[in-house]
Amino acid sequence: MKKIDYQKLLDNALKSVVKDALIHAQFNGLGDGAHFFITFKTRDPGVVLPDFLRIRYPDIMTIVLQYSYNNLNVSDKEFGVQLTFDGRPFFIRVPFSALIEFKDPSVDFMLSFQLKIAPSAGNDME
């Protein structure tokens, strides 16, 4: 008989908190100095990144949602957002299953999730 994976159940429940926070930001914006640091696995299925960012961040990347983001769109399984890199706008899509960490330093809030990746050479953990 298969055991209950409580860590997976907990991670899924906590990811719904992230989803709800992003939905709030999608419809209400980020007020009162709120800003999100979102760390995710760049090689997970469903992650959409420009090629130059995949090269720069082969395993893990952290994005910041604060002032310069547009078109935040949240669904049950993922979120997408337009961010500016090197002065140009790019669309990023991140499945919630790829999340490693979510922070809102304005209220000293942080969630961490199980990290299961095979490291590659030059892994840059920002």
Cite the ranges covered by each PLM segment:
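Eukaryotic intrinsically disordered, low-complexity regulatory linkers and tails enriched in Ser/Thr/Pro
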Residues: 1-126
